[in-house]
Regions:
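Extracytoplasmic "Venus flytrap"/periplasmic binding protein-like
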Residues: 69-139, 173-176, 278-287, 365, ...
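Extracytoplasmic/periplasmic solute-binding protein
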Residues: 154-158, 163, 187-241, 285
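Mature extracytoplasmic/periplasmic domains
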Residues: 295-296, 331-408, 429
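A structural signal for short loop-to-beta-strand junctions that line the ligand-binding cleft
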Residues: 103-104, 133-171, 318-320, 394-404
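Conserved C-terminal helix/tail region of periplasmic/extracytoplasmic solute-binding proteins
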Residues: 2-5, 173, 179, 394-445
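Glycine-centered hinge/linker elements that transmit conformational signals in sensory
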Residues: 193, 237-268
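Hinge/lid segment of periplasmic solute-binding proteins
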Residues: 110-162, 307-309, 377
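Extracytoplasmic/periplasmic substrate-recognition and gating elements
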Residues: 72, 175, 259-262, 299-363, ...
Length: 445
């Protein structure tokens, strides 16, 4: 629905407030944060901000400590925080957006940017970025653009994530599979799964250990597979970037490996919704695709022999890319845009906040903060930081624009369609045709 004139005036007035406040606020912030002292100039007395995010207990504890430091630096500003698990958070945020307004500052998923920007729930941040109220000089420009919608900045990345492959190095060595490198191929990955299954290793309960989870359900991995071939998920906000033949080939590849017994059985894949419930987490598979942020859960569960490897390639071309693990946005209906953007800047750029938050949201997008915090990392967290550096040197294509509205529904539809393939209810070709028909309807609605 087109934005009303009153809605446009409201957004434009908030832009004017941000622009007018930017220079003075930015100067006051810089002085305050550099001197580690309080300054009443950067806030109005008696202001309460709301700030929400999703994540585990460790992330919650660290975030609250960083927020407490912000409050100390901004007398008169109180930040009321709330957090939940991912699913509950997404439902609540959608309800808030439909009911008149999201929190003053909200943690956002990459897949939500188009939905909430186009729906008028987020405040444009271009002036805040341009005038340095939200400082972005230490962020990669292409990565910063992942928070844009139709050319305007609506959110700023809070973490830089990348897909990878958690694998049991002892099992790989036992099967004679070399350590995966950034240029290993999908064919080599498939052969590795076959070799591991052929070992006949037994999982708890006496079942044979397979090579990996069946990632035909995983749209993120399909995207990596597509990008490695020069393709993409979306050609535009209303059009898919791949064909029925592309998806049929991918699902046939996955389906064949499952039928061979090289990857997990359908029921094991269907119930995988966490590290602990995945085939690898249950000891039924030697590897699994995952994002860097949750990767440390695998060695914590299974032991230090679990390492993080690159996603396979097509002829050496990597399809993985640096994606915002999450972003920060400001609610369009906030009554305190200056203080809200100040909180965003503080969480992204203050060294003390960086020390507190660490890598709880994956690699900090501020290069200086990331390098500073990396010096203290150990174990799995240090490994994912080194992995990101290695992949950056190998060479990755730029990240795509934020997915279009409807992408969240399509991710669910993608998994549902492949479930039918897994349970032999339809063929890869027919499932691909049905999914593309549904996707086209969703994107055009």
């Amino acid at each position: 629905m087109p934005e009303s004139r009153s809605g446009r005036r409201r957004l434009h007035s908030r832009r004017a407030v941000l622009a007018a406040a930017a220079v003075g606020l930015g100067t006051a912030l810089t002085a305050s944060l550099s001197a580690c002292s309080s300054s009443g100039d950067v806030s109005s007395e008696g202001i309460t901000l709301t700030f929400s995010w999703w994540g585990n207990d460790d992330r919650a504890e660290r975030t609250k400590k960083a927020v407490a430091l912000f409050e100390q630096e901004h007398p008169g500003v109180t930040v009321r925080t709330s957090n939940a698990d991912f699913g509950s958070y997404m439902q609540k945020l959608a309800t808030q957006a439909a009911g008149g307004g999201i929190p003053d500052v909200a943690q956002l998923d990459y897949r939500q940017i188009s939905q909430y920007s186009g729906g008028g729930a987020l405040l444009p941040l271009d002036e805040a970025v341009e005038h340095g109220t939200i400082r972005t000089s230490e962020m990669d420009e292409e990565f910063l653009r992942t928070g844009t919608y139709e050319g305007e900045q609506y959110a700023v990345p809070m973490g830089r994530g990348i897909t990878g492959y958690a694998y049991d190095s002892k099992v790989y060595a036992q099967a004679g599979v070399p350590t995966p490198q950034p240029d290993w191929t999908w064919e080599e990955w498939a052969d590795a799964n076959r070799k591991i299954a052929a070992l006949g290793l037994k999982a708890p309960g006496g079942r044979t250990v397979v090579g990996a989870n069946d990632n035909g359900v995983n749209e993120d991995i399909f995207e990596d597979w597509l990008r490695g071939r020069g393709g993409k998920l979306y050609a535009s906000r209303t059009k898919l970037g791949f064909t029925e033949d592309d998806l049929t080939e991918f699902w046939t590849f996955c389906d064949t490996l499952r039928e061979e017994g090289a990857v997990a059985e359908a029921p094991d894949t269907a119930q995988a919704n966490s590290t602990e419930t995945s085939p690898m987490g249950r000891g039924l598979a030697a590897a699994d695709f995952t994002w860097d942020a949750p990767f440390p859960g695998y060695p914590a569960l299974l032991g230090d022999q679990v390492h993080f490897a690159p996603v396979p390639t097509t002829d050496g071309r990597q399809g993985a890319y640096f994606k915002p693990s999450m972003l920060l946005g400001v609610g369009a209906h906030t009554d305190h845009p200056e203080e809200a953007t100040a909180l965003v800047d503080f969480l992204l750029n203050d060294e003390r906040a960086g020390d507190i938050l660490g890598f709880t949201r994956s690699t900090p997008p501020n290069r200086r903060i990331a390098a500073r915090v990396a010096k203290t990392l150990q174990g799995a967290e240090r490994e994912i930081y080194q992995y990101a550096q290695k992949m950056e040197k190998y060479g990755l294509d730029a990240p795509p624009a934020a997915p279009p509205r409807g992408d969240v529904a399509l991710q669910t539809a993608f998994k549902r369609a492949y479930h039918r393939v897994m349970y032999d209810l339809t063929s890869p070709r027919e499932a691909a045709r049905e999914f593309i028909d549904e996707a086209n309807r969703e994107l055009r609605s």
